[in-house]
Structure formats: C-alpha cells, structure tokens
C-alpha cells in the first residue's frame, strides 16, 4: 500500500502574523580587517527570502495550496522586496502598511556556510490598530480551511483572542505557533505547536515523555485547546488530544544542517493538510516528514510535494514503513541477509492506545525488526461488527508506521493473517492476550520453518472498546 499525499490543491489557508525579510550576504574570507580583529567578507552573492509568517505562507504555497498572507510592513524597499518574492511563489499578500515603522529585516553574513553575524532592523509594531487585520481575516474566512497565527512577538498579533473568536465562529480551525510564556492569550485555539524549549518555559523542565504528556494534557485543559503538538528536535514530535492516547513520532531527519524556519514548515504543512480534509494525525505525520527534509537545507526553506512524497515513502524505499506485501517480502529477505531477527504480530489497531504502544515496544525488543500486519476495513468489519473500524485502514497504518518500535506495516484482507504469515515466515510470531500458542493464526507454518511463537501480555486497563464506550458516554452528557 502506498501512502497518498493530501489533495493540497483543494486547500486554502490564511496566515496572519509577524512577517519579515531574511537577507543573506555570502562571500569568502581570506584576511582579518586592519581596523579590528574581525574577518573581512568579500560579498559575492546576495539573497532575499521571506521569513517569519511569510515563510509559513511560502511553505503552504510550495505544496500547491492556496496561500494568503496578512501582516504588518513598513513602506520601504524591504516591503517591496518581500511582496515581490512572495508573489513569485504564488502567495497572495494583503499587507497592512505602517508608514511610521520599518519592515522587519534580518541580515545574515555567511562565509563557507558559517554564519558570522546577524543584524536586525526592527522596531516592532506596538500600538498599531489591529482592526484592518481583523477585517482582512473576516473577508477570507469563507474561502479557507485553516487559519495560522504565526507569532514572533513583533506586534502583529496583539489581538489574538479576537482573531481566534472570528475563526472559531466561522468553523475554521486555528493553528498557532506560539511565542513567549503567556499561553493565556492563545486560549481556545485548535492547535498549539510549541517546540520543547517553549513548552518547558511554560510547564517547567520535563524529565521524560510521561511528564511531557502529563503537563501537556493539563495545558490543554487549562487553556481550552483542542490539541497540542510539541516538536522535540531530534526526539521527533508528540501529539496530545483530550480523550486520545499520546502519539509520539520519531524524527525523520537524516542530516541536520540548519533548523532555521523548521517550525514554519511544520505548521505550514499541518495547516495545508488539515485544509485538504485530512485528520490531525495524518497532518502530523506529513509535517514530521517535511521537517526531516527542511532541516537538511541551509536557511529558511520550503518543501515541495515531490520532496514530501519522497520523504513519506523514503522509509518504504529503504526498507521501512508502510508497504505492500511484495515490498515487505523483499525487505524481509534483505534483513535476513544482514542476519537480523524478524518479529511479526498482527491486529486491528483501530484506536491506538498506551496498551498497544507498550505491547509493540515489547515485541520489538524480542528481535531486530518488527512487522505489524493490519486487518483491512472489510476484515475489521467482519471481526468487530458494522460500526468498526473507527479509523480507516490508511490512517491506522500511517499512525503505526510513525511509531519508533515498528519497522514495517502491511495490510491483509482475510479474516486472519495466516496466508500472509505463511508467505513471510517470521523468525518469531507474537500475539497479545490470553491465546495459547497453537491457537494463533500462522503458528503451524512458523513452527514448521523452525521459528518461534510467543504470547505477550497486554497492559491492564487498556482497551479500544472501553475507549469507544467512554467517548460515547462523554458525548451523551
């Protein structure tokens, strides 16, 4: 099975926030200045890129979505350069011009890929009337699927609560990249996307993932958020939602050259994916993949649909992730040549919970590679009843593929995976629950091939059925 990219061309997103122009001066250094002990850079190339909220808008446009941008600028060369650069990449700008302030500009001088100095030209836009921005938001709400508020604490978002209210009244989700420790101003947002440092500045230093989850859930309740996504650099991302188990996604970055603008890419891909009609879990999956691409580039950058598709499918192409049965057989054959022990399990995994995550982690510890075979939607309906699955096959496989413990995810149409297991013949077949080994589908074939069959315990108190009942009970209140 191939993971399908969102239909970005259907998506419309409005970005509102602090726009800025990033200027880069490049050149070699060969001597020290006689005036002061600093290197002399012979500038040979100048580059100008949209930054801040403008970079978010550019990331959205690069995916093929309709991207609109509202922000504050001066009336100067930097504003004109910013407008032209954005027009060149199909971002529709509707700036509010403030004649008393300069456009925020950041100048970086680089030599041999090393940044020597950064010069900031800004005064902030404090005291500027927010009403023109409110009017622009109101005009756009009927044609967008998501609103992004990109906060760099430069003055464009002094009336965040009004902006959130306007969007929520129109049924438009609000995604916010926060700044500072005053999260009260973001009350009622659909999704906040702080990085770990920003998150810990509000909740305190976290010792482990469990503490991140505990404090994050309290934050969600305190500020009436629909969800919280904590981006954790080399540790990946953690998505928290009320009534759902946490979703931890490992980083997909291969090499990290520059984290500048990575947060802009994450929230841009999140918004474009949600506006395309995908779920939040799917949006996080694609955003995580995009972040892995953009940190491998120098400076503020964007991700194209081709790059995103390659990143999403890269795990399958290199022997990991969601794949077809034939691709899995090839991946297993390659693993065996490397002397790796292959473990296999199966299930519906309809609403992934802590018990599933713990079980899969324990299964993975028993070998070098873990295969998870997943019942198709039709198979699940026959097994669990007409109301199941809650989540369709592609979504279930995407979430499983994002787990660090899982190497390969494959689907099967039959009531049991016996045929699939007979074709793969894992070294170890595991199943959770109170089964006897001889009752497990595929056990005879695995034993006949010299493999092992093992039953693992599930974590007490964790059940998809119980979660569904609780959600139904809460919705009836």
UniProtKB/Swiss-Prot annotation:
PROSITE patterns associated with the record: PFKB_KINASES_1 (PS00583)
Main EC class the enzyme belongs to: transferase
Stretch list, region Cytidylyltransferase: 344-477
Pathway: Nucleotide-sugar biosynthesis; ADP-L-glycero-beta-D-manno-heptose biosynthesis; ADP-L-glycero-beta-D-manno-heptose from D-glycero-beta-D-manno-heptose 7-phosphate: step 1/4; Nucleotide-sugar biosynthesis; ADP-L-glycero-beta-D-manno-heptose biosynthesis; ADP-L-glycero-beta-D-manno-heptose from D-glycero-beta-D-manno-heptose 7-phosphate: step 3/4
Gene3D superfamilies xrefs: 3.40.1190.20, HUPs
Protein EC: 2.7.1.167, 2.7.7.70
Pfam family, one: PfkB
Positions annotated to bind ATP: 195-198
Single annotated GO MF: heptose-1-phosphate adenylyltransferase activity
Region (Ribokinase): 1-318
InterPro entries found in the cross-reference section: Bifunc_HldE, Carboh/pur_kinase_PfkB_CS, Cyt_trans-like, PfkB_dom, RfaE_dom_I, RfaE_dom_II, Ribokinase-like, Rossmann-like_a/b/a_fold
Keyword ATP-binding appears in the UniProt entry: yes
Catalysed reaction, written as an equation: D-glycero-beta-D-manno-heptose 7-phosphate + ATP = D-glycero-beta-D-manno-heptose 1,7-bisphosphate + ADP + H(+); D-glycero-beta-D-manno-heptose 1-phosphate + ATP + H(+) = ADP-D-glycero-beta-D-manno-heptose + diphosphate
Catalytic residues as annotated in Swiss-Prot or TrEMBL: 264
Self-association state and partner proteins as the record states: Homodimer.
Function: Catalyzes the ADP transfer from ATP to D-glycero-beta-D-manno-heptose 1-phosphate, yielding ADP-D-glycero-beta-D-manno-heptose.
NCBIfam families: cyt_tran_rel, PRK11316.1, rfaE_dom_I, rfaE_dom_II
Protein family membership: In the N-terminal section; belongs to the carbohydrate kinase PfkB family.
Protein's UniProt name: Bifunctional protein HldE
Source organism of the structure: Klebsiella pneumoniae subsp. pneumoniae (strain ATCC 700721 / MGH 78578)
